[in-house]
Amino acid sequence: MSLAGTLWAATATAAGPAVPLWLGRRTGRGKEFSARLGERSGIAGLARPPGRLVWLHGASVGETQSVVPLIQALRLARPDLALLLTSGTTTSARLLAARLGGAAAAPERSGALPENPGVLHQFLPLDRPAWVRRFLDHWRPDLALFVESELWPNLLAALGRRGTPAALVNARLSARSARRWALVPGLARQMLGGFRLVLAQSAGDAERLARLGARDPAVPGNLKWAAPPLPADADELARLRTLVAGRPVWAMASTHEGDEALAAAADRAARERFADLLTIIVPRHPERGAALAGTLPGAARRAAGQDPDAAIWLCDTLGELGLVCRLAPLVVMGKSFLPPGGGQNPLEPARLGAAVLFGPLMQNFADIALRLVAAGASRQLAGPEALAAEITSLLNDPPGLARMGAAAARLAAEEAGVLDRVMNALAPLLPAP
């Protein structure tokens, strides 16, 4: 183990006594489920199914959305395999329950997914050696698949000692993250070199991963292209379309702190041209809704059962971005204008035929953003000061909005084969029946 890895293990062990207090604070803020706190220390909340088990880890909502089509493909190709999905956020647990669990799922209490009994969810244990050992002793995975970029030194080292094969799927590494990892080159080599297979999102990601120690990363493409369109209730969509008929509509999606103020400022400026403008704000974390409502005087709030009959509609409910992206022909991506940025997934609205705008800070989705812009499906703005003018211009040009949406649909169709390429690459690592 590298010196940095040894220091990390010692620090994680020493920090153990302080973890319950930290978890308690997170629970109070809605970031942990009190009934499932044991999972964070490796105490399983469910029994391990018999037979072979493949474990997939996706840190948060974005990774969970990427991995759902992979889960479905694995279930179809290998119904004999049990699948364990871990994540680290309550929002991702709720999303997975909504996508795979059905009405009987209760993510606040259990990781069971009744509609897909061969798929289980658990929260990832914190990276303390004893807790990692407890987690692996219980689940005994035959293969571990890590999605995108969240890597934990003690966890990967424990898998290596047990001889459990691991792969890094849909891997991404921004230039900024690569520079940070280069400060601890031994630890980077230790973690990345332990993967039997690395599948990168883009050629740039593959190059950066290889420089830090990944062995021969392949580039099958980005699994985000394989994700199904975000769902929406058809009856509710029809009702809302009737309510907003005749109004120009735009949305800011997956907003983070500071984005809502930008949306409100753009709303005020664009309203000089469109007096009946509807601005929809969709916070990435719906639990922020109550606090946000206090900063948006007069806004209607979805979580309070209010319809979009005000200037601004705060859609602070989980799993309704698909509804909003079908309602608004123009969607602006949050987390792309203010530092540190990183962006949110522009494919979600683009796949649904919405024109998409984003700011200069799209480093977490750089390849997708470049391709959407090149295809004429999206536009990247230099900064927030350009937002109101661009919104006004596009809402004044419905045919132009439609052309951008059609371009996005064509590009998504061209990338439809990425899931097959990923499955073919994983096939040699899957455990024998």
Q: Which residues does each PLM region occupy?
A:
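Catalytic binding pocket for nucleotide-activated donors in carbohydrate/polymer assembly enzymes
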Residues: 195, 211, 326-410, 425
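Conserved sugar-transfer catalytic core signal across GT-A, GT-B, and GT-C glycosyltransferases
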Residues: 155, 259, 320, 344-345, ...
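Donor-nucleotide binding loops and adjacent catalytic segments primarily
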Residues: 73, 79, 86-89, 93-96, ...
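Acidic donor-binding loop of glycosyltransferase active sites
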Residues: 139-143, 308-341
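Short hydrophobic helices that act as membrane-entry/anchoring signals
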Residues: 1-27, 189
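Active-site and donor-binding regions of nucleotide-sugar-utilizing enzymes
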Residues: 20-234, 255-257, 270-272, 284-285
